[in-house]
């Protein structure tokens, strides 16, 4: 299996956009990852050293909580304050520097409780046995099984452990300007033909149908690439198969990109072609400013962009819908990722305190308030439908489990899919694009084969 590096995933609300490597995923080099994985593999069954005693002389147990979003430090400070008031025998120290995670593994001193974006990177650590099995916590039974399935789809330690409990689910789609749609009599499209017709209506009116920011290649990757691929293919099934093929992959293989992604490419180009002139010279910041000012009808971005658009125009009325890529409305699906998952270090000597804190974080009042505030979706079974009008268009799809995890999240950073996508959108050579992906995948598989 290809091994990717630790990362940030899509971020909701006022959070920052993905960075340039693998959709904003904060990465470490392969040497650091393998060193950490090796250290954990050797130390997984060794108790943590006595330098971290379970409780102080006062009877108060201090636990370290590393969460993956510096932008929500204030929220968690209040949550911790409330928790400590109810649990005076536990003190929680918040750490928002996720870059300390791998060094802490090498030192055999990981944080007691963590939140991490959950995809290939975190799953690599799960498979090494770093995280405790949380299936026995009563709170585990409150998680929506469909959302828990997203976590489990990346693999489980010992094949059956529940190493992470989802806390926040982010959904991305097509952001649209409600006022422009209303002014031109355009309804939210539910089929591919309706989407193309909407684009042509705006184009005829002199309005850019889509604001493209192709100078930042990650915006092509998480946008047109992920949306079209996710709505067309069984993304998870494809990457399971190509991982199993390993270094034996070639363009002629049944499991290859060439054999599977050919049908996706024409629609990626068609979507890209509806962008404004000069999209190749515009970046994400340009797009936020321009779309906020009403210079386009649609924007292929995720929830992290919403607050930036409102910042550019406080009166803008926004909505979101999944990009339809077939002419059957029932085929429509939305791109999601587990933006925050809760984990406990397997060898923490403060397990009871850590479990109490995780159980508190998964109370509906905590989970639901966080997600409502940050334009994300609750991971709980019985959560109320979001009241945020910016994302209500995605809510039915999330509720029904009509979603996929983006194809871009399955690539290790060693495969520069964003660069190849950018070259494809500019040069329109689909055969070369797919052959390049097959060759890159094979090279990385050869280097990481163990």
Please place each PLM-identified region on the residue numbering.
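Conserved C-terminal helix/tail region of periplasmic/extracytoplasmic solute-binding proteins
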Residues: 2-3, 7, 13-24, 182, ...
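N-terminal secretory signal peptides and thylakoid transit peptides that target proteins
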Residues: 18-40
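Short, well-ordered beta-strand elements
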Residues: 59-70, 90-95, 113, 163, ...
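Extracytoplasmic/periplasmic substrate-binding proteins
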Residues: 80, 121-123, 262-350
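Hinge/lid segment of periplasmic solute-binding proteins
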Residues: 119-172, 196
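C-terminal lobe and pocket-closing loops
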Residues: 124, 130, 302-315, 326-419, ...
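Extracytoplasmic/periplasmic solute-binding protein
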Residues: 161-167, 196-250
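Glycine-centered hinge/linker elements that transmit conformational signals in sensory
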Residues: 201, 242-279
């Amino acid at each position: 299996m290809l091994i990717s590096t630790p990362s940030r995933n899509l971020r909701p609300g006022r959070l920052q956009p993905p960075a340039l490597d693998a959709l904003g995923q904060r990465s470490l080099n392969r040497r650091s990852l393998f060193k950490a994985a090796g250290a954990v593999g050797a130390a997984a069954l060794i108790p943590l050293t006595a330098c971290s005693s379970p409780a102080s002389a006062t009877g108060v147990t201090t636990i370290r909580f590393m969460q993956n979003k510096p932008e929500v430090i204030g929220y968690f400070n209040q949550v911790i304050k409330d928790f400590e008031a109810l649990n005076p025998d536990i003190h929680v120290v918040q750490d928002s520097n996720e870059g300390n995670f791998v060094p802490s593994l090498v030192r055999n001193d990981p944080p007691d409780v963590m939140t991490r974006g959950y995809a290939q990177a975190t799953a690599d650590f799960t498979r090494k046995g770093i995280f405790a099995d949380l299936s026995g916590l009563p709170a585990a039974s409150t998680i929506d099984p469909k959302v828990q399935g997203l976590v489990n789809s990346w693999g489980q330690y010992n094949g059956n452990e529940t190493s992470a409990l989802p806390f926040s689910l982010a959904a991305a789609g097509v952001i649209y300007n409600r006022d422009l749609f209303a002014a031109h009599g355009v309804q939210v499209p539910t089929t591919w033909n309706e989407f193309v017709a909407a684009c042509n209506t705006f184009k005829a009116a002199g309005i850019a149908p889509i604001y493209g920011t192709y100078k930042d290649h990650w915006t092509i990757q998480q946008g047109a690439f992920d949306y079209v691929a996710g709505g067309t293919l069984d993304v998870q099934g494809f990457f399971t198969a190509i991982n199993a093929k390993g270094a034996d992959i070639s363009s002629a293989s049944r499991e290859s990109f060439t054999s599977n992604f050919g049908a996706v490419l024409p629609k990626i180009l068609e979507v890209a072609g509806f962008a404004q002139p000069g999209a190749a010279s515009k970046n994400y910041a340009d797009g936020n400013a321009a779309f906020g000012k009403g210079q386009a009808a649609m924007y292929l971005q995720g929830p992290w962009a919403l607050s930036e658009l409102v910042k550019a125009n406080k009166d803008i009325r926004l909505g979101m819908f999944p990009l339809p890529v077939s002419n059957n409305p029932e085929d429509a699906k939305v791109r999601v990722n587990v933006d925050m998952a809760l984990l406990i270090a397997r060898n923490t000597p403060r397990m009871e305190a850590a479990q109490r804190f995780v159980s508190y974080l998964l109370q509906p009042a905590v989970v639901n308030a966080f997600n409502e505030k940050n334009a994300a979706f609750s991971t709980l079974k019985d959560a109320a439908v979001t009241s945020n009008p910016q994302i209500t268009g995605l809510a039915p799809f999330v509720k029904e489990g009509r979603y996929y995890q983006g194809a871009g999240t399955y690539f290790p950073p060693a495969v520069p899919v964003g660069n190849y996508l950018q070259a494809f959108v500019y040069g329109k050579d689909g055969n070369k694009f797919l052959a390049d992906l097959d060759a890159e995948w094979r090279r990385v598989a050869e280097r990481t084969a163990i």
